[in-house]
UniProtKB/Swiss-Prot annotation:
GO terms for MF: carbohydrate derivative binding; glucose-6-phosphate isomerase activity; monosaccharide binding
Organism from which the protein derives: Nitrosospira multiformis (strain ATCC 25196 / NCIMB 11849 / C 71)
Predominant place of localization: cytoplasm
Full protein name: Glucose-6-phosphate isomerase
First-tier enzyme category under EC: isomerase
């Protein structure tokens, strides 16, 4: 029997500790400890984490680490790396860590070493990518492939899109990359607008090859291609698949020789470094892709071996939990001061909320505490001119992760210094604010002072790296992956299933059939849903 989280000694100690610390201000914490900005830092795999601007003391950190230990975080990390079936509800191993393991490592699933299979797929991906990049792979009519379109949804889209945007600086610029995920026909129409089918390759990404949205778009892609090529066999040169289901891939009409596999022990939201990343490898090349994998692996090893109080993913996970469960914070803002990371917050939304958006524990009981925060964000400095006002002076506590780089990939005058000056200024302003006395000293009228003062005491992490490289990106993604794992372990939930996604799929399939009944006589929903369907059926005919 698992001891309920809220009954653990460290949890109770943290509840008491929160009462003593909740009124402390970061101004005082920094004044009392001139070296706080040096002490509350950690560094690994090229990432420097400054967590000094958090509402914590040494005692807070000690108790949070104690909580992680009491909740069996060390044992669960070891279980994941061993290949145990820690995805309890689906009885599967969770081994995205094997996707980036070096060739000489050995990781067993049901007694079988999976690492050779991983590298066999990576080698096939590299061979295929080189053929596309060099022009050796040609379409049915002999034209060179110039357009790559990835069709997928969820983890089969968010990871590839994020990685492509993040590593666009390293991409081959004579190839265009587009991504289709939404079943809304507009997504397909706009993604294919202006493209020559004879120069276009579709990568169909679906673990089961039965995902409704992906298959709908894949069939539309095939029809789009056939209008130009008019030869079903010829179309084969324009489609490849990433899937675990060879039978369905063949049924669709893709040669299974052009199927790149991955495995049931890879969850969709953890799959960007598997064959799902084929579009990424084509864009940046096999060498850069392997550098990204090396960054993932290095962070995995740090997570596995570093003491919890110096362990970047553990520290970030514990800090997020601290605000979520004790301060009542409900969201986390991720704010990359790097335009190439513009899709990173959206990627983290799925990673975090699909993993830890759960209310049932591993032993089947309902939680009596908050689980996953809502993750959101935009690149700096854009966000400063939209939602930062709420973070500074609103009524909600919103912890923030700031991400920045010391070197820009695109030197342009003093742009990068301006960008980073804003990052540093925001973390300082959020922490220390501006008192009414400071505002008055500037000659501001008394009536206006409350409006122009800032409470501060808003917690932030700052992650700094030298520059955005494939290796850095891999380390950064793995950092958040393992932070999510840390939180899910402490909350005693299964971070690797997603049953909430399934119910909507079932209902959508049923309603899809009902939309074909224009009279609506077969509707058996609630009065609201029935009325909406009837109105839709009536108006779509106009």
């Amino acid at each position: 029997m698992i001891t309920p989280l809220t009954q653990r000694p460290a949890w109770k100690a943290l509840e008491a500790h929160y009462q003593t610390i909740k009124g402390m201000h970061l101004r005082q914490l920094f004044a009392d400890d001139p070296k706080r900005g040096e002490r509350f830092t950690a560094e690994a795999v090229g990432l420097y984490l400054d967590y000094s601007k958090n509402r914590i003391t040494d005692e807070t950190l000690h108790l949070l680490v104690q909580l992680a230990e009491e909740c069996g975080l060390r044992e669960r990390i070891e279980a994941m790396f061993r290949g145990d079936a820690i995805n309890v509800t689906e009885q599967r191993a969770v081994l995205h860590i094997a996707l980036r393991a070096p060739r000489n490592e050995k990781i067993l699933v049901d007694g079988n070493d999976v690492v050779p299979g991983v590298h066999a797929v990576l080698d096939r991906m590299a061979d295929f990518s080189d053929k596309i990049r060099s022009g050796d792979w040609q379409g049915h009519t002999g034209k060179r492939i110039r357009n790559i379109i990835n069709i997928g949804i969820g983890g089969s889209d968010l990871g590839p899109v994020m990685a492509y945007e993040a590593l666009r600086h390293y991409s081959l610029h004579n190839l265009s990359f587009r991504f289709i995920s939404n079943v809304d026909g507009t997504d397909f129409v706009e993604a294919t607008r202006g493209l020559d089918p004879e120069e276009t390759l579709f990568i169909i990404c679906s673990k089961t090859f039965t995902t409704t949205e992906t298959l709908a778009n894949a069939h539309t892609a095939r029809r789009w291609m056939l209008r130009q090529i008019k030869d079903l066999e010829g179309v084969r040169k324009h489609f490849v698949a990433v899937s675990t289901n060879a039978e369905e891939v063949a049924r669709f009409g893709i040669d299974t020789a052009n199927m790149f596999e991955f495995w049931d022990w890879v969850g969709g939201r953890y799959s960007m470094d598997s064959a799902i990343g084929l579009s990424t490898m084509i864009a940046v090349g096999p060498e850069n892709f392997r550098e990204m994998l090396a960054g993932f692996h290095a962070m995995d090893q740090h997570f596995y071996s570093a003491p919890f109080d110096r362990n970047l993913p553990v520290l970030m996970g514990l800090l997020s939990l601290w605000y979520n469960n004790f301060f009542g914070a409900q969201t986390l803002a991720v704010l990359p001061y790097e335009q190439y990371l513009k899709r990173f917050p959206a990627y983290l939304q799925q990673l975090t909320m699909e993993s830890n958006g759960k209310h049932i524990t591993l032993n089947g009981s309902q939680v009596d505490y908050q689980t996953s925060p809502i993750v959101w964000g935009e690149p700096g400095t854009n966000g400063q001119h939209s939602f930062y006002q709420l973070i500074h002076q609103g009524t909600r506590l919103i912890p923030c992760d700031f991400i920045g780089f010391c070197q820009t990939l695109n030197p342009l005058g003093d742009h990068h210094d301006l960008l980073m000056a804003n990052l540093f200024a925001q973390t300082e302003a959020l922490a220390f604010g501006k008192t009414e006395d400071e505002v008055k000293a500037e000659g501001v009228p008394d009536w206006l002072c409350p409006h122009r003062s800032f409470e501060g005491n808003r917690p932030t992490n700052t992650i700094l790296a030298e520059r955005l490289t494939p290796h850095t990106l891999g380390a950064l993604v793995a950092l958040y992956e393992q932070s999510v794992f840390t939180q899910g372990t402490i909350w005693q939930i299964d971070s690797f299933d997603q049953w909430g996604v399934e119910l909507g799929k079932v209902l959508a399939h049923r309603i899809g059939q009902e939309l074909e009944d224009e009279n609506g006589k077969s509707l058996k929903h609630d009065s609201s849903t029935n009325a909406l369907i009837q109105r839709y059926n009536r108006l779509k005919q106009k």
